[in-house]
UniProtKB/Swiss-Prot annotation:
Annotated family: Belongs to the ATPase alpha/beta chains family.
Localisation: Cell inner membrane
Native species: Pelagibacter ubique (strain HTCC1062)
Chief place of localization: membrane
Gene: atpA
Domain of life: Bacteria
Enzyme class: translocase
SUPFAM superfamilies per the UniProt record, alphabetical: C-terminal domain of alpha and beta subunits of F1 ATP synthase (SSF47917), N-terminal domain of alpha and beta subunits of F1 ATP synthase (SSF50615), P-loop containing nucleoside triphosphate hydrolases (SSF52540)
Protein name: ATP synthase subunit alpha
Length: 511
């Protein structure tokens, strides 16, 4: 076999050309101890707080405790594959998540990875840091646009505006999630109108819930056709505590994408009590000193930095908004516990749900006396403001009188009238689950109650009367609904036409 020296030389020269002297430098450390989802790592001297690190088995973690001797890392996922002496690599990146419209209709985990079996996200999807500072004072503006929930009792008495943070608080099994899901479903008609300025994209964050519950919510939204403008971020009960702690921030970052690009988004945190418990678990395992109820000292900051990111931006900054509906579960109606009081003080109002009302059949079980919106009528259309103005006062007087009426039987006519009106209004505010109403339908319904047109209608017939008057307006007087929807006002001639329609129905209804 002949060897041609020139060929050998050519090959060698090519090999030398390809040879590079660039070595890949990575900062690595070693696992000192691991257990309960926490790893103590030695050697990562330049690691940043909140930085992602990678273990030799491919699992990820986040550096939270930066101490002089070692670094405390919380592990995302199973820690059983990690053992003492394993190599830990810095990734150089702070925890981030995919953002954008590609996530609509998807279910993702606490890190933004799809878990719905519909395939991976597009590689070109934008990514954004999970922990960012909330907008300052100058970029914000006052809340002025309504965020319609489709529930009469909320839209008329505790209105929520775009860019507001309204807490939903109550014991277990009082319908907190149902209120939030109704708010998502109600956006369908608004989003179908095609007006990009009115569209509201929704993000539902499930923290520490059963997988079956999350699946049920996904199914409900799909059946209502609401998944096409919704993203579900799920850190279920079987997920590691760091993922449950991180999921709300991940969801918030996804919502901020819409807010910062001049669009509107709604985010629901279900629920923040479980996030606080997950954070307490992490903090205690990281040997951080406990405070009240064994929560760490910065548990207030945990929620305040999250909820402050919900805002209505000024027109110079695009005029986008992020509305937050955090949910808190109380124990035995105790709203003076640590986490409930914290979140009440951070938010712009709260919707109280009570077990007692729920069991009486008043659903949604909203305690109108204790519920408040600190934005108030600024977040209502003129028509709703006009018809529901006196409603809160009438219901407050009714509750006061109802308490005294139990003791006395001989009541004067005005008291009897007040009690009658109050019971009719309470009945009117009941609403079936997953059947939200448009603003125009709500205005007609509340108008009937407040103006006294239901005073002589039997209590059991109120729901039927309400559905009939709305049906009659839709079929015979659609201009009433159109006028309220287009102008947001209840004009004099529209009101007169509505009164005539009500009187016409009452003639046939009572006979």
């Amino acid at each position: 076999m002949d060897i041609n020296p020139s060929e050998v030389t050519k090959i060698l020269k090519e090999q030398i050309k390809k040879f590079g002297d660039k070595a890949e430098v990575t900062e690595v450390g070693q696992v000192l101890s691991v257990g309960d989802g926490i790893a103590r790592v030695y050697g990562l001297d330049n690691v940043q707080a909140g930085e992602m690190v990678e273990f030799s088995d491919g699992s990820k973690g986040m550096a939270l405790n930066l101490e002089s001797e070692n670094v405390g890392v919380v592990i995302f996922g199973d820690d059983r594959k990690i053992k003492e002496g394993d190599v830990v690599k810095r990734t150089g990146s702070i925890v981030d998540t995919p953002v954008g419209k590609e996530l609509l209709g998807r279910v993702v985990d606490g890190l933004g990875n799809p878990i719905d079996g519909k395939g991976a996200l597009d590689k070109a999807t934008k990514r954004s840091r999970v922990e960012v500072k909330a907008p300052g004072i100058i970029p914000r503006q006052s809340v002025s646009e309504p965020m319609q929930t489709g529930l009469k009792s909320i839209d008329s008495l505790v209105p929520v505006g775009r860019g507001q943070r309204e807490l939903i608080i109550g014991d277990r099994q009082t319908g907190k999630t149902a209120v939030a899901i109704d708010a998502i479903i109600n956006q369908k008609k608004i989003n179908e109108s095609g007006d990009e300025k009115q569209k509201l994209y929704c993000i539902y964050v499930a923290i520490g819930q059963k997988r079956s519950t999350v699946r049920q919510i996904q199914k409900t939204l799909e059946e209502a056709g609401a998944m096409e403008y919704t993203t579900i971020v799920a850190a279920t009960a079987s997920d590691a505590a760091p993922l449950q702690f991180l999921a709300p921030y991940t969801g918030c970052t996804m919502g901020e994408y819409y807010r910062d690009n001049g669009m509107h988004a709604l985010i629901i945190y279900d629920d923040l009590s479980k996030q606080a418990v997950a954070y307490r678990q992490m903090s205690l395992l990281l040997r951080r000193p406990p405070g009240r109820e064994a929560y760490p000292g910065d548990v207030f900051y945990l929620h305040s930095r999250l909820l402050e990111r919900a805002a209505k931006l000024s027109d110079e900054h695009g005029g986008g908004s992020l509305t937050a509906l955090p949910i808190i579960e109380t124990q035995g109606g105790d709203v003076s516990a640590f986490i409930p009081t914290n979140v009440i003080s951070i938010t712009d109002g709260q919707i109280f749900l009570e077990t007692e009302l729920f069991n009486q059949g008043i659903r949604p079980a909203i305690n109108v006396g204790l519920s408040v919106s600190r934005v108030g009528s600024a977040a209502q259309t003129k028509a709703m403001k006009k018809v529901s103005g006196s409603m809160k006062l009438e219901l407050a007087q009714y509750r006061e009188m109802a308490a005294f009426a139990q003791f006395g039987s001989d009541l004067d006519a005005s008291t009897q009238k007040l009690l009658n009106r109050g019971s009719k209004l309470t009945e009117l505010l009941k609403q079936k689950q997953y059947s939200p109403m448009t603003v125009a339908e709500q205005v007609i319904s509340v108008f009937c109650g407040v103006k006294g047109y239901l005073d002589d209608v039997e209590l059991k017939d109120i729901a039927e009367f309400e559905s009939k008057i709305i049906e009659k307006c839709k079929s015979e007087k659609p201009e009433i609904l159109e006028s309220v929807l287009s102008s947001g006002k209840l004009e004099e001639d529209t009101e007169k036409s509505l009164v005539d329609t009500i009187m016409e129905l009452k003639k046939n209804f009572n006979s």
